[in-house]
Amino acid sequence: MGVYDAIRKCVAFVGYPNERGFSAIGTGFFAYIQQGGLDFGYFITAAHLIRNKRPVSVRINKKDGLSETQETDTDKWIFHCTKNMDICAYPTTLNPRGDTEPHDVLYLTIESAALDGHELHESGLTIGDEVFISGLFASREGEKRNIPIIRTANIAAMPEEPLWPSPAVSYLIETRSLGGTSGSPVFFDLSRAGVTKKAEPPIIGLINQTGGSYPIMIMPYYFIGMILSSHAQRYEDDFFPDGPQADAEFNAGISVAMMAHDVLSFMNDDPNMRRYRDNIVEKKTRAIGHRPSTAVESSPDVRNGSSS
């Protein structure tokens, strides 16, 4: 199946600078949600990529054809309140002035793009259906900029029981390829199932272009989850080993994917995420004397982890 190229703009690579430029260990994606009418942007990825003693960096593509590597502040990462939920978020600056925004990114409008709950049931998504994954291929991350690839895959098992040690049920996806997908978003082309989720296409994201940011509708792609690992592995020790792992070393061809429901629940309802947003709104309100019309100016920038 053909895939609209803009979907690759929602991802960036997680890793470390090295003598060649950058060594990627996994993927993450940009998404934003609203709370109280305010926009909050995040970089979402798998927590096991971040839970180590060394601060990780994120390499983001730019409109000039190059990229920018930004070291993250370890203390700014927001982890799920349940330790074994393998997801975390880094607050970013969502710049509505696309003509001055150097980064070539697509922020997923996660709430309208997600296939969840009743709509997931109505979609008919089932074992054997084809899905696609946007993310890193570990053998070709790109020298000057990220080169995300699109992997086509198939649902090997629908979410039924938790896969130890995660407390949440997950998809098993036959990816037929090696590592690098941890933290990658997974999409389903609903048109191939012969059904339509809504009368109107979803606003799947906000894309920065010269002249400003604008909503982009990519019908009928829907977000169904996030890759946790590109292997099915029972860890005998701590679920989060001390340091990154090359999951290609014990790749089994089966990826474990967190459901969109759990990604949405983390972003909307997790106490750690809500506490962060509540603090931002409170500080902004005190500073200007009334409820702000946007939270963008207060959101930490992935470039330096600072807040205004």
Language-model features and meaning:
Residues R8-V11, Y16-N18, I25, R51-T175, ...:
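Serine endopeptidase catalytic core focused on the charge-relay Asp
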Residues R176, G305-S308:
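Bergerat-fold GHKL/Histidine-kinase-like ATPase
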Residues H48:
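Histidine-centered active-site/metal-ligand motif
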Residues Y4-A6, F188-N304:
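C-terminal subregion of chymotrypsin/trypsin-like serine protease catalytic domains
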Residues V3, I33, L120-S123:
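Short, surface-exposed secondary-structure edge patches
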Residues A31-I33, M158, D189, S229:
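Residue-level recognition of beta-strand microenvironments
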Residues T45:
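Cytochrome P450 catalytic-core helices
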Residues V11, P17-G41:
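A conserved glycine-rich beta-strand in the N-terminal activation segment of trypsin-fold
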